[in-house]
Amino acid sequence: MSDRRQNRKTPDEQRKANALIINENIEAYIAICKEVGLNGDEMLILENGIAIEKAIRICCDGKYQEKREKKAREAQRADSNFNADSIGIRLVKRAGSGTNITYHAVVELTSRSRIVQILKSHWGNELNRAKIAGKRLGFSALFASNLEAIIYQRGRNAARRNGSAELFTLTQGAGIETRYKWIMEKHIGIGVLIADAKGLINGKREGKKGVDANVKLRAGTTGSPLERAMQGIEKKAFPGPLRALARRVVKANYNDAREALNVIAEASLLLKPQITNKMTMPWCMWLAARLTLKDEFANFCAYAGRRAFEVFNIAMEKIGICSFQGTIMNDDEIESIEDKAQVLMMACFGLAYEDFSLVSAMVSHPLKLRNRMKIGNFRVGEKVSTVLSPLLRFTRWAEFAQRFALQTNTSREGAQISNSAVFAVERKITTDVQRVEELLNKVQAHEDEPLQTLYKKVREQISIIGRNKSEIKEFLGSSMYDLNDQEKQNPINFRSGAHPFFFEFDPDYNPIRVKRPKKPIAKRNSNISRLEEEGMDENSEIGQAKKMKPLDQLAK
């Protein structure tokens, strides 16, 4: 048995270790909230939490700060009052009490040096070390990337620029900030690393600076950024010819290198790459869970397994989500809190590319497809309509899929072989094998004859799966369970519907350009409440109930 396996923590030990880090994050978050004037329930407003974490990531980004200071020096020549250290954070604050509570947006000023000082007091002085701030902020950046994947389909745009838009399901973590990308490599899709490698190959051809820099590689060695990218791709790629292709890219000529990367990406739609899935919540949600669980909190500090679903549910009971005027499609439309709760759930669990019918079977309320949602960008808007706690909860749970490679020479009992699954639940293959074969058949090697042989072997692997597609199942023997079924006594069978969350698959479709027709919205009188607008007495039993319940419960 390897030392690594011998030193592996038990679930209880792992949760306790997680709790130490999570509690330090919470304390730093509370201190920064107080620094910018947030108190009590204001710290539990989701949009405030997202804004604070973004400010922390910016303040810890040395290269960003260098650029900012350079611009500041230029600006100071024109304006002597310009302060490069100043940072503004847009937040939601509460005013009033009892039944007269209102919310409004404000910009609070603080300084980068003050935020860094607070972080050092809670995490230690070496914020540049990956083990100190890197992993903490890496998970924060991963959540932000998951959010953007759902709202804007960032991965599709990246895939279109670097090959085919059909590869977007390989782009988990496409929006993650560059400085956290290598720290979070095992949580990032192979398509993101392939896009980076193509950028480096193009940069080398164009003579750009930095492409030949010395960076740290595995096993303590150093090499070029392209070598680092290809090491990551080789580790993630399906065993066999795809990994052999990855090893050839660094020394290949421009055309062969790009085509080899295209083959790896297109084949990975079916010959699935390795990726690690975890639940990641904003720190305001961890704070909400701690306030409820108190002494039991450490037992729920889990990123996977049943307790990850439980702690998410507990946090959802206490957080507040804002409804602003203005959605992605319509500046006059009011956001739906229930839709934002769905996006939050999908971002925490990284479910943008999971089978939507499976996700729908695991939660308490009906879910919507992306094109039917009324959501903004989760930043603090100008006009706050209301702040409510959402009702959405998980009612079932499943183990997270770690996506280890399928061995085609076994009795077809390998792990799942599509690239979108997050949960290890048995299902049929949903990948379009014929389309993958069409993509691969377009590829021809230019000069390096061994590449042609490797391409042939890749096609053979695809064909084996294609011929046996009806018999092969992903995650054979794995199921979902009721949330109270801790011992997995009663597995729940799932019949795959293969429904995507993103309703369209037209590669030329851009959700930002396609606008829904604006619906006329009656202007509200800001001096009266919504209940009065509906002709209801705020102090009546029905009025009090409507005021306290989230929107999705009001519809019942």
Swiss-Prot record:
Compartment(s) where it occurs, according to its Swiss-Prot or TrEMBL record: Virion; Host nucleus
SUPFAM superfamilies in the record: flu NP-like
UniProt-listed InterPro entries: Flu_NP
Post-translational modifications reported in the UniProt record: Late in virus-infected cells, may be cleaved from a 56-kDa protein to a 53-kDa protein by a cellular caspase. This cleavage might be a marker for the onset of apoptosis in infected cells or have a specific function in virus host interaction.
Any one cellular-component term (Gene Ontology): host cell
A Pfam family assignment: Flu_NP
Keyword RNA-binding in record: yes
Region (Disordered): 516-556
Keywords: Capsid protein, Helical capsid protein, Host nucleus, Host-virus interaction, Ribonucleoprotein, RNA-binding, Viral nucleoprotein, Viral penetration into host nucleus, Virion, Virus entry into host cell
Keyword Ribonucleoprotein appears in the UniProt entry: yes
Subunit structure: Homomultimerizes to form the nucleocapsid. May bind host exportin-1/XPO1. Binds to viral genomic RNA. Protein-RNA contacts are mediated by a combination of electrostatic interactions between positively charged residues and the phosphate backbone and planar interactions between aromatic side chains and bases.
Protein purpose: Encapsidates the negative strand viral RNA, protecting it from nucleases. The encapsidated genomic RNA is termed the ribonucleoprotein (RNP) and serves as template for transcription and replication. The RNP needs to be localized in the host nucleus to start an infectious cycle, but is too large to diffuse through the nuclear pore complex. NP comprises at least 2 nuclear localization signals that are responsible for the active RNP import into the nucleus through cellular importin alpha/beta pathway.
Name of the protein this chain belongs to: Nucleoprotein
Species classification: Viruses, Riboviria, Orthornavirae, Negarnaviricota, Polyploviricotina
